[in-house]
């Protein structure tokens, strides 16, 4: 913003709350304005646009000054002498005024105006919240700024948002009076989807505020935002239909609902939704994963096994979206029909179906005539793999067993309206698919493989045109169609690294354009009780009628090793360095897995007895059976007492197993410890004095690929983990060729269950599919304790128990919080 001189703004100048919990700083504590500049997410509001004089013949104050006692009460920092030790460098005032004239235009307090922008750029938008003259007779006004969408984290995706829509900020600073350009008309409207019908003629309108901490778009608290001078000022801000802003009474009523429904997209084996439901349960909210969608059939089998109450769909999400739209049409046609169906209608349909079943039992096929008995399922896609995508029903034919069931296109069932109506009515009643407004919460991590650093052909210029990134668009389109109350998107940090954070900005822009509040943060798995450093991005969304959830602060002391883009490093969920907090000691590999029984490279048992006792609190609680855990229903399939699932490793081939047996059982051991390898300045080379060693198969003990990996500078090939370590991440492939995966004391890679422990899966969570598929499910999962912590803050938001702060302290640690009865107090060693 235009200024005569460069100086620091005082705490009084900028009213962004400066809670130590809001920012993690690697340097000494700084004030909120300096933090904003360090984040560099916005064009600087403090830069001088072009030379302006503080006093001008075309700018002057009008009328008598505000009485001294009134002015000193409202702006005390302007009338106190600066202490040399104080950070307060605010300008001092001789008089305050209510009106000023600039270039013949009369301005009043609380008027809105354009303020001179930088050369060649648009003028800034602000509310005049203060007018004063300094002891040196310089004329200033204080601006409270509005952001255009492109001034926020959305940046280049500002086109997603209405050009007339702006966002209020808490940022204020002083500017020379003659920087005012002209008055503008800004209206405040209710933050709802019908806003376009309610917008009166204006230059701009706003319904949310934007704060730099955690890049937050949120509702405006009208009571706290109202100026005491606004009634006198003749302000040109109009508040329109304010009753549309959320009301606490509605929120309290909603929190008494028996359950909240969750749709898990890109669900994998269900780790994210499982954790969210755990956390919500701890907060006092019953969250149920009603629907889940994933393209991997083995992951779907795992989720269904552990969550029999969930409708699990194994299909692409774009087909799922098409199905949702078709399902809504069918429900309109057969159920709603312009009005809600009565219970008697639904019961009549059920009775008709039962009658048809009874009649079918008396019939037997006497010819090859196929008659539809009932419809079993519905999908959109190409189930017959005949390149004819569309809407299909699975048909059970009258007089035939299930082996004759087939998928039939809707066009071929035009004579089966009764069967179709029965299916739709029952499906509607059972909510086999969500209709708009029925999914309270949508979570998911749309794969964005086009941003991966392993992808050499990334499209940096147009990331959304890359087929590998299109799932982000599909995810947002599903949200747009279903209109859930809450949204949580998870993704890799690369979405903020790649192409200037293009995809992350797009995601925020889509949510805001759909009238969702939004907030972005990064969380490290190790900070919530796991021995791994993995960092992930989480984006919250909440309708204007709901409270925007916060992020849970860490419970364990772990320093992340992830490379975070400088522009986004301040959204890391963490305590500030100067904040006194009591964090538990980081969990290491030993504390997580050393109670598990030894297994061999070729072990193939999918379940076995523990044969051991837990040695740490983590091990004690991670072994809990379903009946002992929060949020698990009685119909969940319970593991037999004392049985351990999935504790088997990927079987290495003969050559790799022989190599692993040669790796010393010591900290830091890897292929560099093998005979014939020299290391000079962290780069490997062959030892010319040693003859190359060969395996029984005739292949070399030290493979060439190990010597050339990362140009000979990597120590990862055939690396052995150690008990006191924390792993960088849990991988999807258990091959030891370029990863540190070997067990500290056994000649094998970590087992599926050991990897699952590192991701926080309870031992009772059984996985399905081939061994490699189970490793993939675990590696792709969201760490369960991270999801649990987020579920807890979601529950607080639903209950109306959280404030506007982006961060919340957790009153528990993982995994002791899983216990249905907390008779044993966690001593902090977990």
Place the predicted regions along the sequence by residue.
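Epigenetic mark-reader domains in eukaryotic nuclear proteins
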Residues: 31, 36-105, 136-251, 346-349, ...
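Class I S-adenosyl-L-methionine
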Residues: 323-359, 374, 378-390, 431-439, ...
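Eukaryotic short linear interaction motifs
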Residues: 2, 116, 121-124, 133-140, ...
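C-terminal target-recognition/interaction regions appended to catalytic cores
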Residues: 260, 404, 598-830
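Conserved proline-anchored active-site loop of SAM-dependent methyltransferases
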Residues: 262-276, 397-399, 435-457, 486-492, ...
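PEST-like, low-complexity acidic/proline-rich intrinsically disordered segments
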Residues: 1-17
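SAM cofactor-binding core of SAM-dependent methyltransferases
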Residues: 263-324
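Short beta-strand-centered aromatic/proline hotspots
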Residues: 110-111, 121-134, 141-144, 373-377
